[in-house]
């Protein structure tokens, strides 16, 4: 019959900076800047559980501290390729769930660090576990990209086709990305290429992409059902 209060934050313990959880693999796409109504204590956020709970000796128990329904979320596929990344065989794309913690069109709350488990209802209406990932303490207004696993029927094969020296420290590299889809419906794969840095230019591309940072280029690649 205990009252429970969850405190979210990263306190120092005298032995250097410590983290209770490492951030998930790219869980926060963009950090939010919104303020909510949660009670704060210094740099910490407090999450009191609404009802008392009883926990037996050595028992593990799940309790709810956030109940939001109808929040929009989008399931996508993603593949991130490192600089000069080339694979002899096709690699599985990541299954990614994207959502927002913003007040408008999102969860409308800050999230404490921990593991998020994702369930999806099957054809019979039964919830089935489809993956999990850890997140760091997340401010409200953030854009989240939660990787829940790999899609073995959506593949990407990056290939370095040619690399030519153009000067003492200048190179021209030609890349090819081959995407295949063994699913009965069309999909879109968010393809990212890392390692471009500030002096790298993309001079030719078969699909228009976007430079999202100094070292990252992204393309949204539509792949037909049972096609490539």
Task: Describe the predicted segments one by one.
Residues 1-228:
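Long, intrinsically disordered, low-complexity accessory segments associated with secretion
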């Amino acid at each position: 019959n205990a009252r429970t209060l969850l405190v979210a934050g990263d306190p120092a313990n005298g032995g250097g900076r410590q983290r209770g959880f490492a951030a998930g693999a790219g869980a926060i796409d963009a950090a939010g800047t919104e303020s909510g109504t949660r009670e704060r204590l210094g740099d910490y956020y407090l999450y009191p559980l609404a009802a008392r709970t009883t926990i037996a000796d050595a028992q593990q128990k799940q309790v709810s501290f956030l109940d939001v329904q109808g929040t929009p979320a989008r399931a996508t596929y993603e593949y991130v390729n490192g600089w000069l990344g080339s694979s002899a065989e096709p690699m599985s794309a990541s299954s990614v769930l994207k959502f927002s913690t913003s007040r408008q069109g999102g969860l409308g709350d800050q999230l404490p660090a921990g593991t998020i488990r994702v369930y999806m209802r099957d054809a019979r209406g039964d919830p089935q576990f489809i993956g999990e990932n850890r997140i760091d303490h997340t401010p409200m207004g953030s854009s989240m990209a939660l990787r829940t696993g790999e899609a073995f029927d959506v593949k990407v094969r990056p290939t370095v086709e040619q690399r030519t020296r153009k000067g003492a420290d200048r190179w021209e590299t030609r890349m090819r990305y081959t995407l295949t889809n063994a699913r009965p419906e069309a999909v879109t794969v968010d393809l990212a290429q890392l390692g471009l840095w500030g002096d790298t230019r993309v001079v030719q591309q078969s699909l228009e992409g976007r430079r999202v940072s100094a070292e990252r280029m992204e393309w949204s690649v539509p792949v037909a059902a049972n096609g490539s």
